[in-house]
Amino acid sequence: MKKFLHSLSAFLLFAASLTASLPCGAQTEVTPYRPGVTTEGITYFLPTTGLHIVVRAHRVTYAPGPYAAFAERFLEARNVEQLPTETWTLTDIDLEPFGTANREQAYTIKLNPKTSAPLVSLAPDGCLLAVNAQAPAVSALTQPSVIRSTPRTSSRSVETQEMLRAGNLRTKAELAAQEIYDLRENRNLLIKGQAEFNPKDGEQLRLMLEKIDQQETALTAMFVGTTTEDDHVFTFDYVPTKDVEADEIFRFSRHLGLVERDDLAGNPIYIEVKNQNTLPEETLDPKADKKKPTDDLRYCNPGTARIRLFTADRTFVDQMLSLAQFGRIEHLGGALFNKKFNTRVLLSPTTGHVEKLDLETQGQ
């Protein structure tokens, strides 16, 4: 994820309170500016945590050969399928947490012309990544892909002139079978050293046998068919908003692969989200100023949720993950951002929590 930096010529003014908090889901006053530098300060968002679901599946595709009906007659190959088939296997499901801007959690760092110039790093969607520090690059999410593990072979390239000129399918099949038997005989003669044209050395013999094997495989496929295999990666996003016990996210069919939730041809895959309520209850100091600071740095103290992805008979994912939306917003007081200190802050692009806080006294 790219980030852009804003170097400002004004000082940062925050409220005097070092720490305070308010519910993460509470509605906030949003300054009507786009994220970035404004006349009043720096407008930024805090993130909501989404789940990038990565589904991996293996597909086996069978295509019958044009001479499948004659496989037993000419090659003595029994039980050859004459109809195409496609078989899918759900191999794995992974979760990749990511952050996306929460438009309801927008804040502005107000500036004072008497304070020092900070360096602020924002994500492209406006989420705050760093103050007075260089934010590291965000890891890219897995993208959909298809990887073929079995190459397709073309049988047409090994058809002889007699096969091409044959008037009916049965004759073509008979000629193809005879060509297979001829290739097998030639292989045996080469191995025994009795061929009409013997190879000069071992390497030439290897190449000749390899060519015969390729031709026999292609011709045999015209009777017994071809099987190809490939690995598919599907991805989609899910943003938890509350506890759910068994929310159906997609279906998977042995014959169709990944299908929509309303397609009853597939079996359902569910997600369970359970807030662990790991954050302690907020305690208020009766002597503290009840007025909430409005111009200091906000960050999220995320909550923890248990995430499960499962079917009726298998669990694919069972993880504890930090989610911004299950936490609350905290304040980093303005006392840390004045001319006495050089404060550097790194925030998580996924949850908005403070990953690193460096504090140096000016002049040291």
Predicted regions and their residues:
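Positively charged n-region of N-terminal signal peptides that target proteins for export
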Residues: M1-S7
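Hydrophobic helical h-region of N-terminal Sec-dependent signal peptides
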Residues: S9-L18
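N-terminal amphipathic/basic membrane-interacting segments and domains
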Residues: Q27-Q364
